[in-house]
Amino acid sequence: MIQRHLGQPRLIQNGGDAGGVKAVAQKQTQRRLDQIFPAGRGSHANLHSIPTGYACIIAALTENSQRRHCFAARPSLCVAVMDDSKTNLIGLSRDQLIAEMASIGEKPFRAKQLWHWMYNRGETDFAKMTSISKSMHGALAERYVVRRPGVTKELISADTTRKWLLKFDDGHEAETVYIPDADEERGAVCISTQVGCTLTCRFCHTGTQLLVRNLSAAEIVGQFMVARDSYGEWPTPDDGGRQLSNIVVMGMGEPLYNFENVATALEIAMDGEGIGISKRRITLSTSGVVPMMKECGERLGVNLAVSLHAVTDEIRDRIMPINKKYPLKELMQACREYPGASNARRITFEYIMLKGINDSAADARALLKLVKGLPAKFNLIPFNPWPGSEFDTPDIKTTKAFSDILQDAGYSAPIRMPRGRDILAACGQLRSESQRERASLAKARAAAGIADEHHG
């Protein structure tokens, strides 16, 4: 595994070569930093989490619990704190962007120019948008920014899966993963839609991190843009030359509980004059929010994946509490009514194999009965263990026997081998990396008998 900390500063205590930036350490700045980096209070260990583009002055506690300022030695990282008075143009729909330009007296063509530069070229600096007049650069910069989420950490697995820990303007975090195709030089970007998750599926690590908030459209589409930054895929390449060829909305959170922001983000991603990902290359996964499934299909027309994982209400109630609200009968009816579902665009049923819970031959036959008449295919996912999980992974013989029953009935039912397991990027393993680190740090401090009152 390769681990890379991005924007890692060297710590300098008061004095020394920090004098040149002391003026930045005003009370207003400190209050803003406390909002952005609440987890950094009281611990030098979290200094590496400061992303490029944020001010790198933080408040740290000395041994006698007196607050003092520490500075990053890299001047390039000592920049102005985020200006909340400026509107981020990323995440605005075309109509919203046109309205913003109209508010400053500009015609719709200005919005079209900006759209091209932001989403086709990946540009964030107005001064480098050469088709826009120089006189306009300053006017735009006074009111607007083009900003992606900050990258706190990038992890690369032995199998080339890549995971980014992203930090948003308010200090909250989510994870984004690039999953390479096993056979081709391309892959999918798995994006998150919530900080934490509304649901509490018992087999899923993300479900142990309760919902904090929904992500905005900017924070959702921004994840794909961060991935493109990392792989250097700007300007938007032709379909044949794309490594980041697909989007799967399968990260942290339930997308249909944040549908408006998810829809806006995906509409931006699908726009042919920008990022240009075809709807046929986008798959949205839901745990079964029945009332929103039809609207999703009608508005977006993307591929649907359903996190099924059980063939009876009894088992699904146990491992997926959402089933108590939308039981299997209602869920399967919503699947049958999903717009655009056909033999050419089958619904994917995701099925995590849990040893002794849902992995028997009888379960496989019941699954066939459940989807009868539906244009369906299956992804069989051996359970990916995580610390504290209560489930086990079935052996390969059991999993293959399950798959064979489905395939003998004419369905595609590959066994999806875990990708990125060594960096906790596999299915069901996503959870804020820094939250794990803070939990580990808290345990270590407790074991050492050190008070932890300043740790979140």
Swiss-Prot record:
Residues 183-416 form the Radical SAM core domain. S-adenosyl-L-methionine binds at residues 253-254, 285, 307-309, 384. It comes from the Bacteria. One of its GO terms (molecular function) is rRNA (adenine(2503)-C2-)-methyltransferase activity. One of its GO terms (biological process) is tRNA methylation. Its cofactor is [4Fe-4S] cluster. [4Fe-4S] cluster binds at residues 197, 201, 204. InterPro entries: Aldolase_TIM, Methyltransferase_A, RlmN_N, RNA_MTrfase_RlmN, rRNA_lsu_MTrfase_RlmN/Cfr, rSAM. Reaction proceeds by a ping-pong mechanism involving intermediate methylation of a conserved cysteine residue. Specifically methylates position 2 of adenine 2503 in 23S rRNA and position 2 of adenine 37 in tRNAs. m2A2503 modification seems to play a crucial role in the proofreading step occurring at the peptidyl transferase center and thus would serve to optimize ribosomal fidelity. This is Dual-specificity RNA methyltransferase RlmN. It comes from Paramagnetospirillum magneticum (strain ATCC 700264 / AMB-1). The lineage of its organism: Bacteria, Pseudomonadati, Pseudomonadota, Alphaproteobacteria, Rhodospirillales. The gene is rlmN.
